[in-house]
Amino acid sequence: MFAFITIGTNNLKKSSAFYSKILKPLKIKKVLSHNRYYGYAKKETPKKIELYLIIPHNKKKATIGNGTMITFKANSKKIVNEFYKIGISLGAKDEGMPGPRHGKDYYAYLRDLDGNKICIFKKI
């Protein structure tokens, strides 16, 4: 359905350090560096960039979208817990601790360093 997702940031290096660590349990890594954006892809498909961290093209401040959330898919509850724990340790804000929601599915919610809402879940 989607070609890729962009997340606006006001501090590309700080945001990259955050996402490089929090995405590690998902086997997603930074594969492209540019002065205005960084690209991330799964380790097994490094040429298929699916996530970009970007300084806004219009050179205005990056702001969060009200009602916008990006959700990552995990292969286990352990990865959900690890993602959440890493995020909190790096300064993310809690938006919902790991646990079952919407039936048995397992979710965790955070706000990244720029205030963007991110989620991780394991379909049960």
Where are these regions (language model features)?
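Short glycine-enriched loop/turn motifs at secondary-structure junctions
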Residues: 1, 63-66, 102
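A structural feature recognizing the 12-helix transmembrane core of secondary solute carriers
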Residues: 9, 31-32, 40, 63-67, ...
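Vicinal oxygen chelate
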Residues: 84-124
